[in-house]
Amino acid sequence: DGSGGDRELHSYTYLTDSYAAGGMWERSEEFDNEQHRWDITLPLTPELGESVNQAYFFHPGQGYGEGDPRHQSRHAQILPDRGVVMALYPIPEDEDSTIVGVLPKGEWIREERALFGLACGVYLAVYLRHSYEAEEAEDRLNVRSAGEFGGVVIEAAGLEEAESLDADDLAGFAELMRGRAPVFAADGRGVSYRSLQSRRLE
């Protein structure tokens, strides 16, 4: 039921020298639901400036206000694995299907259903099931994507990992990742993806 209650909650964290990725397998109902369920976190360095140091998406729930990236709903299924987080949003028909995302400031290549970025020495590939709108804010890139059974897959890679795959800059990383786009099920209830570490995720 997504309420959490007294049941045990399980978290997943993957740490590298460049970033951390992870999330909560289960959602816990908490006061105001201010916590997001998963994220990729970059190191706090002077290079970031005033930018946020996290990348995450969620479906807004009760208490959400425009521009305030908190207060998620209970409609999310996630699979974190190493530097990848996959999330599906099975939102009921009577609710707004828009999911919102927060990305760190950096250099971004925007495509119809994907964004490829470089922020604080970390490459990020962001794939969405539906098209999106992205707006630059003072400290972040705000993303909105609407459509039934939305989904997102994010993979992070450090500079050395990307270079080992012959991606020497953001353009090279984007070229590498374009051909690795996840396959979302026609009904939106599943997704498959092969990570940069050749792990098949479904």
Q: What does each model-identified segment do?
A:
Residues G2-E202:
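Ser/Thr/Asn(+Pro)-rich, low-complexity disordered segments
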